[in-house]
Regions:
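Extended serine/threonine-enriched, polar tracts that run as long, contiguous segments within proteins
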Residues: 133-161
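Membrane-proximal interfacial segments on either side of biological membranes
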Residues: 1-10, 14-126, 133, 155-253
């Protein structure tokens, strides 16, 4: 067993704290868990310091800038120390300001439809995203992005094979009505449809409080499960009720 507790880092790349544990029952299998909290670090430096984050949160590669990141994760490993994705559980919160959304085929197509003015440099004033990973799927809770002439809410799911199912609610735009965009597929091949604005009331004061409560509860369930494994209080992670659409249904009630 290898265990690190409250390992701290201070550098020109940022600062952070890490606790982690690795255990192996035999040469064929093992398990690991970590609790990470980093402040004011460049996204590319975060990925280079902790390559596993790129596996857990592939959407990070779409952003450039400085972020704060809090993450807890646990998983089982095979004999080559590769993550067994079905066993992966993770909770992550990202906060950043003056972020740049990197150009990609998906964004290029959407920006054409929405007539973004600044297509070469897509600056986001601020971003605060909460995500959980469970059952080979990452759920991104709805969050607000303000960019160019638009205010949009984004949420959805992304599989570990990089396929995704996202919804974008356009809350403010030059168009005099609200609309939604469903995007499904992979970065190489995807489809999008104009739909109803699913999140139009989700960020009203009353619904925002309920959404925050749901996010906190789901994150806490994942976090407690990870800490439980790290503290070796149980050999099996506790059962966690899937968040999925049920979380949004709770907010909508």
């Amino acid at each position: 067993r290898i265990q690190l507790t409250d390992l701290t880092m201070h550098s020109n790349m940022g600062e952070g704290k890490l606790s982690m544990i690795y255990t192996a029952t035999d040469k064929h299998r093992g398990s690991t868990g970590f609790d990470l909290d980093v402040k004011q670090i460049l996204v590319d430096k975060l990925i280079s310091l902790f390559p596993s984050i790129d596996t857990l949160l592939p959407m990070l590669r779409s952003f450039e800038g400085v972020v704060d990141c809090q993450m807890a994760a646990s998983c089982e490993l095979d004999s080559t120390l590769m993550v067994k994705l079905p066993t992966l559980r993770a909770s992550c919160s990202l906060q950043g300001k003056n972020m740049v959304l990197l150009d990609g085929e998906t964004f290029t197509e959407i920006s054409k439809k929405l007539m973004f003015k600044n297509k070469n440099r897509n600056v986001i004033d601020s971003i605060s995203v909460d995500m959980v990973v469970k059952d080979n799927k990452m759920e991104v809770f709805p969050f607000i992005i303000q960019m160019d002439r638009y205010k949009v809410a984004v949420g959805g799911t992304q599989q570990m094979d990089m396929s995704f199912n996202y919804h974008i609610s356009v809350l403010k735009s030059p168009v005099p009505f609200k609309l939604g965009i469903d995007i499904k597929g992979t970065p190489e091949k995807f489809d999008y449809d104009i739909t109803k604005c699913r999140y139009k009331d989700l960020f009203s004061p009353s619904k925002t409080n309920r959404l925050d409560t749901v996010k906190i509860n789901v994150r806490k369930q994942i976090y407690d499960s990870v800490r439980k494994q790290m503290n070796l209080l149980s050999s099996e992670p506790e059962s966690i009720r899937p968040s999925g659409n049920l979380a949004l249904e709770q907010v909508a009630e």
